[in-house]
């Protein structure tokens, strides 16, 4: 493919439950099927040498779902980490986790830390799994850290700018997304990367996440390649 490619893609993997319900299956079966799509898109990113992929796996609002579904999602996440970590490492994938880890189980937190430590030197792809995250939480938490840094005398008030503030976000060290993808027909970003998506190209598709395959990913990349990214400026033709 000769057209330009995004270097950081952020994905809201929506529609697992609706996919299952449309087939007369329990919602949890949709979450299981969604893992296959995760693997497909990771492989696509490796093939196309895309440097960073962020997957919104669990939002801070998802705790309001039925307890049985939340528990299943946490167990599925833990099981997938244990099962896939060696393969991810062998393919040169660096795992990172964005979000508030404190409410997660100690077992899951340890597995996440171990995965980050094991893959920290890998350079083929950054796989950023976003868990228990909300964009408002990220900004408020960053503001608190920034205020504490100023009060401690480590930073002057007049030194604060956008670049400095971004260093206190949970995504510090990662580039801002070039392309945002949301599946299942919802036309919103749902409190995901509110700061980071300021100039990101948005792509929405009606396809449920378990049906989002290599072809659907290619369509998103083609759409991105047709965009004129202006970052608040005007194009040369205007």
From Swiss-Prot:
Entry annotation: catalytic residues: 14, 62 (proton acceptor)
Cofactor comment: Binds 2 magnesium ions per subunit.
Cofactors demanded by this protein: Mg(2+)
Alphabetical list of PROSITE patterns matching this protein: UPP_SYNTHASE
Signal peptide: none
Name by which UniProt lists this protein: Ditrans,polycis-undecaprenyl-diphosphate synthase ((2E,6E)-farnesyl-diphosphate specific)
Binding annotation for substrate: 15-19, 27, 31, 59-61, 63, 65, 182, 188-190
Family: Belongs to the UPP synthase family.
Quaternary data: Homodimer.
């Amino acid at each position: 493919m000769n057209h330009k490619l995004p270097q950081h893609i952020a994905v809201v993997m929506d529609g697992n439950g609706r996919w299952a319900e449309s087939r007369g299956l329990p919602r949890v079966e949709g979450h299981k099927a969604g893992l296959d799509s995760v693997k497909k898109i990771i492989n696509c990113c490796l093939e196309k040498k895309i440097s960073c992929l962020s997957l919104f796996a669990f939002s801070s609002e998802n705790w309001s779902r039925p307890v049985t579904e939340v528990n299943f999602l946490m167990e599925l996440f833990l099981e997938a980490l244990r099962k896939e970590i060696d393969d991810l490492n062998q393919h040169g994938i660096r795992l990172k986790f964005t979000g508030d880890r404190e409410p997660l189980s100690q077992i899951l937190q340890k597995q996440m830390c171990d995965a980050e430590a094991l893959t920290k030197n890998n350079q083929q792809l950054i796989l950023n799994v976003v868990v228990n995250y909300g964009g408002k939480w990220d900004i408020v938490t960053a503001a608190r850290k920034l205020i504490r840094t100023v009060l401690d005398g480590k930073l002057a008030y007049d030194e604060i700018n956008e670049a400095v503030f971004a260093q206190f976000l949970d995504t510090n060290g990662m580039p801002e997304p070039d392309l945002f993808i949301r599946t299942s027909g919802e036309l919103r970003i749902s409190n995901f990367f509110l700061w980071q998506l300021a100039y990101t190209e948005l792509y929405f598709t009606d396809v449920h996440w378990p049906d989002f395959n290599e072809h659907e990913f290619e369509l998103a990349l083609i759409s991105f390649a047709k965009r004129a990214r202006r970052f608040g400026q005007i194009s040369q033709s205007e």
